[in-house]
């Protein structure tokens, strides 16, 4: 079982059967997946690169989340947070704008004729929320499709939790939680310490398919 190895950088697969291809894409846990392609290697601008599990913990290089990883949020003390004065029209407009964060999505990326490149976001499934605000964070994580649970747990007990994809803890306890998780075997579990954690609860996957290898592609006739 490839997924059981906990390594998931790249995976190549050849098949002319579309149903089989879709089944593999939906089940394999790797960062970059190549279908019917004669080489396994990411192309800048088409396939953001990075793995899952023991093959990587950060955002994909060349992906939309890459620069965010080098930034740190600077929160103001609560006493300095002064709400702006808005007119009723401004309030109405603010309530009706599109949200900045969308639910799991698939984005088509550019590539040569005869090649499909998709960037896929999917939720991390098993998420523990600890510390102050944990109940609120769990509810927010559930909206993304995560199986999130708010718990009060001794940090040393985290090593006993067998399946875990992420821990949310905004507060001083996060450092101890990170140390405890480092003693676990298997994939590195990220500790999310920023209140704007939604994007970090999403897994990234790049899927590249050579559409010409399946016996023809009608889309090529119009290109």
Q: Can you annotate each of these PLM segments?
A:
Residues 1-223:
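Conserved C-terminal structural/oligomerization subdomain of aldehyde/semialdehyde dehydrogenase
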């Amino acid at each position: 079982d490839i997924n059981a190895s906990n390594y998931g950088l790249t995976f190549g697969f050849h098949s002319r059967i579309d149903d089989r291809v879709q089944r593999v894409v939906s089940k394999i846990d790797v960062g970059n997946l190549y279908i019917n392609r004669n080489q396994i290697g990411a192309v800048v601008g088409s396939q953001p690169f990075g793995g899952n599990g023991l093959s990587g913990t950060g955002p994909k290089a060349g992906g939309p989340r890459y620069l965010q990883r080098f930034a740190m949020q600077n929160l103001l003390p609560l006493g300095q947070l002064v709400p702006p004065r808005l007119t009723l029209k401004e309030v109405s407009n603010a309530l009706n704008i599109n949200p900045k964060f969308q639910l799991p999505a698939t984005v088509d990326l550019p590539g040569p004729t005869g090649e499909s490149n998709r960037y896929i976001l999917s939720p991390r499934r098993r998420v523990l929320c600890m510390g102050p605000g944990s109940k609120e964070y769990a509810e927010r994580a559930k909206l993304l499709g995560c199986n999130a649970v708010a718990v009060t747990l001794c940090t040393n007990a985290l090593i006993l939790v067998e399946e875990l994809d992420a821990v949310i803890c905004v507060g001083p306890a996060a450092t101890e939680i990170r140390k405890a998780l480092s003693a676990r075997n298997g994939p590195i579990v990220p500790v999310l310490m920023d209140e704007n954690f939604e994007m970090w609860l999403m897994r990234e996957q790049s899927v590249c398919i050579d559409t010409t290898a399946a016996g023809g592609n009608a889309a090529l006739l119009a290109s």
